[in-house]
Regions:
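A generic "folded-domain core" signal
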Residues: 2-155
Length: 155
């Protein structure tokens, strides 16, 4: 989805801190945001690191029977076997990782989306394959409207 976003001219809406994209062929829709704050640490010290695109998304892909899938890319390869910890106003969830991508377990997508609709911010904490700890904080202002738009566009 992020590659599609980068190459897409199909931005159809923006809702405060979230954007909505929709592609027609194949039909895919997603709500996406970039972090408001990023902190990278190694051995407890703040470090400057190069990262690719960082984005938190909710994806809808009717052909693949995907409806409201949480997807995160941290802009680097995650440590093998690690998880991304998601904290939304005290509620904690884990995303599983593969390479530069992370997803919720299928049963958790709806729970995370519900928490995001009620919350003000989401903090995602992860570890790179080089041992860097990253903390990305996303605003949830406009999340509900963006997710509802993406869902409707892909019905």
């Amino acid at each position: 989805p992020l590659t599609a976003q980068e190459n897409s001219t199909a931005k159809v809406d923006e809702s405060v801190d979230w954007d909505v994209f929709a592609e027609k062929n194949p039909k895919q829709c997603w709500a996406v945001s970039i972090p408001k704050k990023t902190v990278n640490t190694r051995n407890g010290r703040v470090v400057a690191v190069r990262r690719g695109d960082i984005a938190l998304m909710v994806v809808y892909d009717p052909k693949a029977k995907v409806s409201g899938q949480i997807v995160f890319t941290g802009g680097y390869p995650f440590a093998p076997g690690s998880t991304v910890d998601v904290t939304i106003d005290g509620n904690k969830f884990a995303l599983y990782t593969k390479d530069e991508w992370a997803w919720a377990n299928q049963g958790d997508d709806a729970k995370i989306i519900a928490a995001m609709k009620k919350g003000a911010k989401a903090k995602l904490t992860a570890r790179s394959s080089r041992g860097t700890r990253t903390e990305d904080t996303f605003s949830l202002l406009g999340f509900t409207a963006a997710v509802e738009d993406a869902d409707k566009l892909c019905k």
